[in-house]
Amino acid sequence: MIGFGVNMDGSSLKSWGSALLLGACSLGGCSEAPAPDTGALNAACKTELIVLGAGQDAGAPQIGNSQDSGWNDPALQLYPVSLGLVDHDRGKRYLFDTSPHVTAQLRLFDALTGREGKGVHLDGVFITHAHIGHYAGLMFFGREAAGARDLPVYVMPRMAAFLRENGPWGQLVELGNISIRDLSDRMAVDLSDALTVTPLQVPHRDEYSETVGYVITGADASALFVPDIDSWEEWQTEYAVSIVDMVTEVNYAFVDASFFDDHELVGRDMSEIPHPRVTETMALFAEAPADIRKRIHFIHYNHTNPVRDPASAETRTVLDAGFKIARRGDRVCLGS
């Protein structure tokens, strides 16, 4: 077990329901989203984590899929996975993963946190790995778009080398748009005296970089973010990390839900495709107390995953079993 000194006093925690914000950004452009109700936020929350996207790397609808129902139904449109972390007391904001939809996601982040004016208003970006939905949004911080200055980008060593040595990412470093900050496995980064981020290496396809998840620890609560992993068993055998122990130690766990089950991709041998299935993770925690099951928020679901649809039978199965499904606009409190 890995200890992070988590405060498990549930009475001090606050979370907000899954208010799905309609309006979406496809690869062809962004539709207008309704103005978020910023007045409904709990003013007592000083540090909060906001879901800015819950889909797999390409979001939904996906390119080349003209029959996708999401073209006509905003409720089925997905931004790729991304979390926003805001420290209201210190006026600091951070992103976890930068997708190709980062422009729309930052607009959402601004609206939900009351940020106005020009500029990206970010104090750091934490990247999990070098697959398109998780880092490709960095390109928008370059001179062709935002023209950011010295934006801290927190990455593991292989990922740092990949960004420095390959275009167009190397240009971001050379021009000072981003400033690479090296991470080490299980070594916490202090963002303040009440907010830390700890990377945890996980098994995954590592063509260009390592892959990590993060534990984000605030004054009152903590969250685990593991959007991509090959299997929970491999995490245990290769890195001696138990997903059961991790979920027990944190208050919120945003975990890989790429595929619902092994029948999802018709005509494909899904045994050749890693990622723990939603049904597998549910079975793993089936006998856990309700207080543990409700900490799990399934995220990073593929466009084929039926939990993408809030009205699907599979969504109801997940919710009835006591688990949660992350939706864009969800927010949880890490410190009051």
Show where each model-derived region lies.
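C-terminal motif of bacterial Sec signal peptides marking the signal peptidase cleavage site
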Residues: 27-29
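Residue-level marker for buried hydrophobic side chains located in beta-strands
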Residues: 94-96, 126, 223-225, 253, ...
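Short internal beta-strands
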Residues: 151-159, 254
